[in-house]
Amino acid sequence: MHEFSICQALITQVEQIAISHGALKVQSVKLRIGSLSGVELPLLEHAYPFASAGTLVEGSTLEIERAPLKVNCEACGLESEVKANLLTCRMCGSCLIRVVSGEELTLMSVELITT
């Protein structure tokens, strides 16, 4: 379960942000996660309260936005959304594709309590 270590790294990063802004506590954390990131969302959500215990992040809300899987076809140039189990161009059927989005795990925003 690498989701716990992902949470620990996330909490460390968020705490550094909170401290650098003089925050007393973190209210919410927003992530953007792609379907090809390798992260199991239920496990990440389950690990979050345990990883944040005893930190400025404890008790904060974790919001997760799913990033659509988008590919660019190198044969015809079409950029489109596809399913993770069907990595081919929707227009020409080519397998010569490049993933444009859907692999990311990005910290989008942190809401802080400063007073």
UniProtKB/Swiss-Prot annotation:
InterPro entries: HypA/HybF. One of its GO terms (molecular function) is zinc ion binding. Pfam families: HypA (PF01155). It comes from the Bacteria. One of its GO terms (biological process) is protein modification process. Keywords: Metal-binding, Nickel, Zinc. Ni(2+) binds at residue 2. Disulfide bonds: none annotated. Zn(2+) binds at residues 73, 76, 89, 92. Belongs to the HypA/HybF family. Involved in the maturation of [NiFe] hydrogenases. Required for nickel insertion into the metal center of the hydrogenase. This is Hydrogenase maturation factor HypA. It comes from Nitrosospira multiformis (strain ATCC 25196 / NCIMB 11849 / C 71). The gene is hypA.
